Amino acid sequence: KTEIGRVPLHRLEGIVCFSYPGASPALMGKCASLGVDLSFFSPQGRFLARAVGEERGNVLLRQTQYRIADSEAESCLYARNFILGKVYNARWVLERATRDHPQRVPVEQLKRTSAQLAAALPLIEQCDDLDQLRGLEGEAAQRYFDCFDSLILQQHDDFSFAGRSRRPPLDNTNALLSFAYSLLASDCTAALQS
């Protein structure tokens, strides 16, 4: 095999392995001792496993996490804040596209969608039911993804977007989205365990 480069292991937060390349027990042990997450994904980008070292302490954190998971009111608080962040960030992407590329994007459509997302924010803030929150999140995501194709400004023929699909993703854009969500899920899992 050709060496592409070298990076000191202690400078990494994580290593992501694709297409079953494997990792030696020595590498896995060193990653575990340094707290470097080692994640494995299939050739299609599906999450397979994470190799982590011994969890040290954090009993109080774990107890708090279980308590929150058992309480619908507290779970709702966290879910609401995550969803508010997602919708706020979706609006930011749309507004930035209209500001930075007014000649290349359908400004009116993006502004209209941004306004719809803005109108959803107070509904999300006031919602105290997890199922209703999921519904509001789904509606916001649908609105965002309805105009997502117009945000793709480079290599549009290769990365056009007709709608969200997963398990399996049916096109290049959905494959990239699923891959990014897999990486995000791996990072979130690592954060919850630390």
Segments predicted by a language model, with ranges:
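A surface-exposed, charged beta-strand/loop segment in the N-terminal or early-internal portion
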Residues: 11, 19-92
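Short, intrinsically disordered, mixed-charge
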Residues: 17, 30-37, 182, 190-194
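N- or domain-start disorder-to-order transition segments that initiate the globular core
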Residues: 1-8
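Glycine-rich, flexible loop/turn motifs
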Residues: 3, 47, 157
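Active-site helix-to-loop segments that bind/position phosphate- or nucleotide-bearing substrates
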Residues: 6, 60-194
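Conserved interaction-surface patches within small, structured recognition/assembly domains
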Residues: 13-19, 172-174
